[in-house]
Structure formats: C-alpha cells, structure tokens
Amino acid sequence: MAKIYRDADADLKYLDGKTVCIIGYGSQGHAHALNLKDSGVNVVVGLPEWDKATWERAEKDGMVVKKLSEAADGADVIAMLIPDMVQPAVYREHIQDKLKEGAMLMFAHGFNIHYNQIVPPEYVDVAMVAPKGPGPLVRRMYVEGKGVPSLVAVEQNYTGKALEVALAYAKGIGATRAGVIETTFKEETETDLFGEQVDLCGGVAEMIKMSFETLVEAGYQPEIAYFEVLHELKLIVDLIYEGGIYNMWSAVSETAKYGGMTRGKRIFTEQTREEMRKILKEIQTGEFAREWILENMAGRPVYNKLLQMEREHPIEKIGKELRAMMPWLKKD
C-alpha cells in the first residue's frame, strides 16, 4: 500500500529562514505562492518581464515579484510551475546558473526530470509536490482550512533532508490536511500520461465522437445524439467521482445497468486492452516523449492540425447551439 503523509508527518520548520521561489503564476503557481505565503513562508514569484498583466496581478495579491533569474538567485527552493514544454528553456536561461549548493528544485509534474529534458546538478535536491486538483481548488480548500490530496516524490536527495523539505512545502500549500501520497517521478509521469491518453482526454473524447457519429449516420437528429452521448456524461461521471463505479451502477436504472454491463465489454475488448498496453509501452520507453518534444521543435504542425479538426467536428457546432439553451452554463 502507498505511504500517505498527514499534517503530523510534516513540519514547516524545514522552510524556516528559507526563500521559496515560485516560477510562474498560473493555475498552480498562484495557489502555491499564496498558500505558502499565508503559511508564513518567505515567497518570491519569478516572472518574465514581458508578462506585465500577470506581474501586476501577483503584486496586487501581495506577492514579491522579480525577474526570473533574480527570483531564482539565492533561493532555497525553486518551484517550476510553468508548462512542461517551456520549462527546459527557462531552466537553462534563468535557473541553472543560480542554483546554490543544497537548494531544492521542485516540480508539480515529473515529465522533464524523468525524460532528461532538465538535468539538475548533483549538488541540489530534486523533488515533486503534485496536487491532484486545479490551482483554484488548491487555493479554495486552503482558505477553508482543508486541502487537496497530493503526491510527493524525491528524485535526488543531496542534503539528506529532501523529503522533509518537500513535505514542509506540501504542508505549506495545505496538502497534508488531506493526505500526501508518496510516489516516484517515474510513476507519476508515466501514469499521468497514460491516464490522459487512454482515458481522461483521448479515450473519452474518441468514445463521445464515435458514438455521436454512429447515431447521426443512422439518421438520428444530431441534437438528440448530443444529449445522449455527451451532455448526460457529466451526470454519470459525477456519480463515479463522488462514490466510485459501483455508486454509478447503484444510481442508474435497471435497464441501464443491464445494457451497460452486457454491452460495455463489446466496445472495450481485449484488443482495446492490448492497445492500452502498447500506449503504455510508448510512454515507458520514452517514445511518446521524443515524439512530443520533436513536434514542439518543428512548430507543432501535427498538433495544430489535430486541434483544428477537433474544433471543426460537427459535435462542436451542435453543442454550442444547445448550450445556448442552458442558462446555468457559462456562455461560449
């Protein structure tokens, strides 16, 4: 079973007298910075000079804001809370020459360390604290005296105190109130990518589109198809999210139970499982990472084309029209 750390297992004293530099002030960055500051930690936010709007927002929130290299200079913990694909360049240009002996390089996702896009010097600690929820939720739960479950991992333990410092950071953002699960950079990275590709993003999106196309091709109205295969999905996902898969089965009709349990395996077959294994292998071997890195180096031609195709799918047009009928939703 996984090791889970709670409030009693973490001590903010490991951040006493230290400066935590938060690189970025987006979804996670602003939450980490504000929570740590409210926990009594000395925080500085590092931002590019050209990002005036974010700079002003951070200062309005009461943060000390500096240019990237200045913020990192002399910091004891440097948290890289910017998108994966820009991290390596920012690290090379603004961070690596500012790392002092015994400092900690902190991440919220393991991609760049696991796939060697960032290779820290041996004289620093490397750790990860990854909340399993978006930044606004991390902030809101902290303010309410609660927390969001998170992951913690140590990749490099130069000082011998990397886990203690990482847990102090986790406590500072409120994570230990809920529980912090110990993992590794390898496990977090590979399972995160697998979930995105096979289930959460790739698998669900393709299932919805194919279901919609099947109904429309058979002559059913696209409006009805949209409601049945996309709109109602939230109702089912909420039931699973709140109480697990069996909770969903307990809540739906007997007809839905029987039809789902007898037909679902005809959609997701052993061939599907084999493709899942292939995708996992591509992640484990680094094949996907190399593909994605090269795609970015080439200017993202495949990525941009695929995104355009998604945007132009018929389900998007009909969805926009139907959502206009739903006053409880934010307008597109």
From Swiss-Prot:
Protein's UniProt name: Ketol-acid reductoisomerase (NAD(P)(+))
This enzyme's EC code(s): 1.1.1.383
Chain positions recorded as substrate binding sites: 253
Database matches in InterPro entries: 6-PGluconate_DH-like_C_sf, KARI, KARI_C, KARI_N, KARI_prok, NAD(P)-bd_dom_sf
PROSITE patterns named among the record's database cross-references: KARI_C (PS51851), KARI_N (PS51850)
Organism per entry: Archaeoglobus fulgidus (strain ATCC 49558 / DSM 4304 / JCM 9628 / NBRC 100126 / VC-16)
Keywords: Amino-acid biosynthesis, Branched-chain amino acid biosynthesis, Magnesium, Metal-binding, NADP, Oxidoreductase
Annotated binding of Mg(2+) 1, by residue: 192, 196
Domain KARI N-terminal Rossmann per the UniProt entry, residue ranges: 2-183
Molecular function terms, GO-annotated: ketol-acid reductoisomerase activity; magnesium ion binding; NADP binding
Biochemical pathway: Amino-acid biosynthesis; L-isoleucine biosynthesis; L-isoleucine from 2-oxobutanoate: step 2/4; Amino-acid biosynthesis; L-valine biosynthesis; L-valine from pyruvate: step 2/4
